[in-house]
Amino acid sequence: MTKVQNIKRGLAAVGATVVLVGAAHAVDPGFPAPIGDPSVVPAGAKLDRVFDGGCILTEGVAAGHDGMIYFSDITFTKFCKDASGKFGQAGNIWKHNPKTGETTVFRSPSGMSNGIKFDRDGNMVAALGADFGGQMLVRTDMKTGKSYILTGLFDGKPYNALNDLTIDEKGRIYFTDPRYLGHEPIFQDGFAAYRLDPDGTVTRVAADCGKCNGILISPDQKTMYIISNDNGWFAFENLKQGEKTLQSAHLLQAYDVDANGNLSNRRVLIDYGKLDKPCSGPDGMVADTEGNIWMASRCEHRPGIQVLTPQGKELAYISTGKEMPTNVGFGRGADSNLLWLTSGKSLYKIRVGKNGYQLP
């Protein structure tokens, strides 16, 4: 998810009627050239927009074991309507075929899915949010199409609005639970990150991660990265024109992960509120096989994909112009160095110099 001011900036271009398309390549919006280490992002690498038929916020891009690219389309019900302008959309998961360029609806309603990952067996695991969404973690068997609720309650109470997830090599799923929009009552005591063990046990592993958003485990399984992206509001869609919020922590944080999947030793790698030009924090992220972090940065003056060392030092930067990116994901096999990213209504790709990490 993202900041209220960034979302509202794009609403004027949305309108009441949303056309769902499965077209191939769209017009290149002409992004600035990437900068930084050419071994990370080669000179001349360009973003290619392959889809622009979402409503407001595409998210959660991930490569399936079938070679297809799946991503969420969070259709805010106050803004994304049918042709009559009366009835809100119920969320979509799209499927993009890299070989044909065709993009089709994989699932609708989506339960307002946000983050998507695939486990080692090829099952899709999706974090469902609020705003008439599922507020749960769901696994889909990609062979049968059947879905299963992995967790929908913590301490007997509904989650706020699941946002993003990461899966470790022991099959444990870590997920974040903030709230950015939706009419549903909030029952949890705060924002947090959780761990779902293979036996179904759910543990709150971090209550000190701010408004927890993107989450990523390092390839060596020793470090957990968690984004705090705090817009200072629970239901941005109800803010009146001109109203402002007091925004809090915008951070890239790291934790140690022990053998049991518990987190400790929290430290802040980047405080986006204390940069020379303070800005909103990042969103989703993935890792390459060397442990570098590829992160969707939503800095208002510099939106794009930041490539960082495990210590938070920038190696390269892929500008998305005025587009505010939401999430990233690597392809598989021969396309392991093909980076996919979601932003606004669109899906993009760019060939980079590193291979993405996937579960073995």
Model features per residue range: what roles?
Residues 26-360:
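Sequence-structural signature of mature extracellular/luminal beta-sheet repeat domains
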Residues 2-3, 19, 190:
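A general, composition-driven signal for non-globular sequence regions
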Residues 12-22:
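Bacterial N-terminal signal peptides
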Residues 2-14:
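Bacterial N-terminal signal peptides that target proteins for export
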